[in-house]
């Protein structure tokens, strides 16, 4: 089944909702980076949220990057999305292992850490990208995005993100972001709070085979949910030999000349998709000449 995000509102327009199924996206990330279960969960949750946040942007050329540094053994988590919800991402230590919670659930916070920041960079085509840094509040990812929306955008939000992995494969992944609009009335707020209070976990809903449409109807029960559109999303890296070349330029003339002299070739990998690019001595000399 393809990955997609539903964009919806309540009948009165006072609540907006984004509900995603991202199993293929997260599985592709797991396959490319060979992540452990807990790293897959941390990266998968971040990719799902980043994809939805990408769809919140207005212009086609807008780009969004999320960087999570929690001080934990997973290292830095980086995810980036375009305005169509197409994402890519990676973690510093894809082989991280931590003890599960006593109930058997993955302890994502132990891998991510709880002392750190969430950084959100929005490139809206202006001279300077918008750059915001916010404290990490839990390390479980969903709560951290909830806090980000409350503080950065003054938008009360409910964020739920889930990834379920069996053996070496992602079984289910998805999530939702539901937000109150500034004109939301008490009645709407009370109903949404009532719904959220009795919600099963997103992982359980996905495990039960519930589609984004089903989840939307549960979250916005009694609020007449109205689907505005359905956006197909996925993992996409637009790297190329030409783009990756910037890494060779960045090391400087002296280091590049040393590589040419000692190795006569260079291999450069893309961090987002792990694709490797080989540069021959001739190509390296050409790059050096252009510097």
Curated annotation (Swiss-Prot):
Q: Name the cystine pairs.
A: 237-239, 270-273
State one Pfam family annotation. HSP33
UniProt keyword Chaperone, yes or no: yes
What terms describe the molecular function in GO for this protein?
Answer: protein folding chaperone; unfolded protein binding
Gene3D superfamilies the UniProt entry points to: Hsp33 domain, HSP33 redox switch-like
Q: Which GO terms describe its biological process?
A: protein refolding
Q: Does the keyword Aminoacyl-tRNA synthetase apply?
A: no
Location of this chain's protein in the cell? Cytoplasm
Matches recorded under SUPFAM superfamilies: Hsp33 domain, HSP33 redox switch-like
The protein's matches in CDD domains, at most eight in alphabetical order, are given as:
Hsp33
Q: Which UniProt keywords apply?
A: Chaperone, Cytoplasm, Disulfide bond, Redox-active center, Zinc
- UniProt PTM: Under oxidizing conditions two disulfide bonds are formed involving the reactive cysteines. Under reducing conditions zinc is bound to the reactive cysteines and the protein is inactive.
Q: Name one GO cellular component term.
A: cytoplasm
Q: Which family does it belong to?
A: Belongs to the HSP33 family.
What does this chain do?
Answer: Redox regulated molecular chaperone. Protects both thermally unfolding and oxidatively damaged proteins from irreversible aggregation. Plays an important role in the bacterial defense system toward oxidative stress.
Protein known as? 33 kDa chaperonin
Q: Which organism is it from?
A: Clostridioides difficile (strain 630) (Peptoclostridium difficile)
Name of the gene this protein is made from: hslO
